[in-house]
Amino acid sequence: RFVDKLAKVALQDGSERWVYVHLEVQGSAQTEFAERMFVYHYRLYDRYRQPIASLALLADGTPHWRPSQFGYQALGCSIALHFPTAKLLDYAQDQNALYSNPSPFALVTLAHLLTQATRQDMNARFAAKWKLVQLLYQRGWGKQQVIDLFSVLDWMMRLPEQLKRSLWHNIEVLEEQEKM
């Protein structure tokens, strides 16, 4: 069992205290998820003896599955972990806001939602991916950031070989136009 992401961050108020941020990305509804968050939280605390902030990014397609706590009581003792969650599905209703948001996180959220929406239609996925690639070039980001974000999009929004070749052709044409 390994955490998805663990980062050591300094607080902005100038204090010297460290907080470990545990970000768990969950792609499917699992009944034991909240318990796993609890287990990771206490294991991280046991190892580092520092404050742990456990955060959950829910990337599943189940609207009502929203775990946010785990705890238990026994013989007068109790313990609980309450953790904040972000549900990517919540952003599906306002995709226009994601398209216009300049944040790379909005673009990746949009890619995730479009990947889920186009599971059965590769032509629609191609069109969605091409639109996101065009956004990458329009945002004015640096070359490395465009490359990094494209790598994420390419990994998330997989295409059959023929459509992949078409996408690369479109990208080559776009890059030629950008040079002009």
Please provide the spans of the model-predicted regions.
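Conserved single-residue anchors adjacent to enzymatic active/cofactor-binding motifs
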Residues: R1-Q162
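Long, amphipathic alpha-helical segments that form or neighbor coiled-coils/leucine zippers used
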Residues: F150-M180
